[in-house]
Amino acid sequence: MRARSSRGVASVAAGVLAFLSLLISANPAAAAEVTVTGAGSTWSQIAVDQWRADVASQSGLRINFSGVGSSAGRQFYLISQVDFAVSEIPFQPDEVAKLRASNRSWQYLPIVAGGTALMYNLKDASGRQIRDLRLSASTIAGIFTGRITNWSDAAITADYGRALPAKTIIPVVRSDGSGTSAQFSAYLARTSGSDWSRFASAQGIPNAATSNYPQFGSAVASKGSDGVANYVAGGSTGVGSIGYVETGFAVQRGFPVVAVKNASGNFALPSAANVAIALTKATLNSDNTQNLDGVYANTNKASYPISSYSYMITPTTGLNPDKGAVLGKFMLYFACAGQQKASVLGYSPLPPNLIKVVFDAVKKLPGAPAVPAINKSTCANPTLSGTLGEGASSAPKGSSAAATSGGGGTGAAATTGGAASGAAAAAGGIAATHAAAGSASGTGQYAA
């Protein structure tokens, strides 16, 4: 077993080196002198920052990125203050009108998949950290609309299987325009019954997903995913709090995330395998944006229901060709070798059909670098080898796999994708499903 593992590591390393040599072979001097700038999503920022560091150290590419939130990132792109943006939701109708009026071109391409997790800080009566919390969609909606305000509420007891101490719940929401808020509220709007519609009406917001989550009742609003995660993890002041972040932010801090009840009645954690399984029911619109209705309704026992993709937004015209070359090399890197780190960072890697979407987008850039064929020798994305990378089937660090064995659950093995074969099935299944559904039309699920 050890010998096979060593050969596998050597093979991956050789593939990464070959890919990096491809990236720097074309005009390395120009690449070293050009800086490409982007802004946007904090949901994706852990991955983007890792990839920026990788290409800077390995090939000298200079990529700047500011995690200012999806809404601000789109605005910076709209007024040409950045070369690319990253967002969990596409441009809204008013933004599209401004883009067209200014002749600013754009295209969407997926960069990474992940789960929007509910990170929490909760202790039992003896003061020990609770790490196996389970909640249903109705209970989550109750907490994040103000209907449920105490951890001893009967709905929480029913989901978790035992009573929690009587303590006020502190929901932590985003204070800034956020793709994370949009993804989370889209889930609530689709799964919570009347909770979200009543809340939306009371708050004067559309009965749909929103980038600007209202502050309500005992809720605390924090800026950025880091702000939400830091509040929840913030010592005594964070006890009793629960906030929505991309899984990686909880993993970084060693804090637990909720096992969410899915459409099968099972409770699932946002492991890379569970996210990949959930996204086998996602469909792509003609512009490569996502429709997640099937994800929320996915009846696979392992499916994590609050799963989604994040997009990069780039121009197809009007970009300096030298910048286009650098941006294109960065895109080729994160679609391939960069995805090896997705699972350990708290994400799930892009499947083969979405690698192709990225490669096709690179070809549309001014000054685009050479784009290789997609295979294991040119692209070190783990899904091309039928896996999701290291740690794909594990419970996120800080969370107990016991969270998946309550209620209608059937144990951690069932809900975390089991052994490596479960992750491999997810890697293959998501590609096949997206390939079949790639031309689905959208449903207008987002509202600014």
Specify the residue positions occupied by each region the protein language model found.
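Secretory targeting and sorting signals
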Residues: M1-A31, A448
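Flexible loop/hinge segments at secondary-structure junctions
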Residues: A31-G438, G444-Y446
